[in-house]
Design a protein with these regions (language model features):
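Basic, helix-initiating cap at the start of DNA-binding domains
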Residues: 1-22, 26-35, 52, 64
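Hydrophobic/aromatic residues within well-ordered alpha-helical segments
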Residues: 7, 50, 57, 61, ...
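Amphipathic alpha-helical segments enriched in hydrophobic/aromatic and basic residues
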Residues: 19, 28-29, 40, 50, ...
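Short hydrophobic/aromatic patch on the recognition helix
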Residues: 37-47
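Hydrophobic alpha-helical connector segments
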Residues: 56, 70-96, 144-147, 169
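Amphipathic alpha-helical packing segments from all-alpha helical-bundle domains
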Residues: 66, 85, 110-145, 170-173
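Amphipathic alpha-helical segments used for helix-helix packing
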Residues: 91-115, 156
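Hydrophobic alpha-helical segments that form the core
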Residues: 92-93, 138-160, 164-178
Length: 183
């Protein structure tokens, strides 16, 4: 039996390419299969609906980012340097992917994706809590949630400018690294 992965990946790649130039809401099954050079029936062999396809696209995008973030953090102890490495890995990954804007912003309002967005944000906040604790935050949860939102905003600024904004990146790290007062 032939593996479904090549066709599935070709369809996901096609959607990711389309999202580099089009809004999430405007990506149709017909556009996806045309971009992939596949028949419409092949789409439905992998996903029962467009909504499930968008979930798979969102999951793959974030899984790839998480891989690079975890690799950047792997050898570093919790604290400033690890937080900076994670943030830079995320932002550099977003900047390199033209579909980022659709998968970061538009997915927040797309039916069927809001639970994934919330879960990814929570996961990202949880990942940085040891760093915030090492920086002196005794109650890091609200700070982590705010940092997740701020990093996503920096990603959008950088996408619009088509380049890194090291000043924003350093500014956010300064906020996270400030000496906390009683929480």
């Amino acid at each position: 039996m032939r593996s479904p992965e090549p066709g599935r990946n070709a369809l996901l790649d096609a959607g990711q390419r389309l999202l580099g130039t089009a809004d999430l809401a405007r990506i149709s099954v017909n556009a996806i299969v045309a971009e992939a050079g596949m028949a419409k029936g092949s789409f439905y062999q992998h996903w029962p609906s467009r909504a499930e396809y968008l979930r798979a696209l969102h999951i793959r995008f974030h899984d790839e980012l998480v891989e690079s973030i975890e690799a950047a953090m792997a050898e570093l102890p919790p604290g400033h340097d690890r937080l900076e490495a994670a943030m830079n890995a995320y932002l550099d990954g977003c900047l390199a992917e033209p579909a980022t804007k659709a998968l970061l912003v538009q997915s927040r309002t797309e039916a069927g994706l809001t639970d994934l967005v919330a879960a990814r944000n929570h996961s990202a906040a949880t990942l940085m809590m040891p760093d915030l604790q090492a920086l002196g935050w005794s109650s890091p949860e609200p700070i982590a949630a705010l940092l997740v939102a701020a990093v996503a905003e920096i990603a959008l600024v950088e996408l619009d400018a088509r380049q890194r904004d090291d000043e924003l990146r350093r500014g956010l790290l300064r906020l996270a690294s400030r000496t906390p007062t009683a929480d």
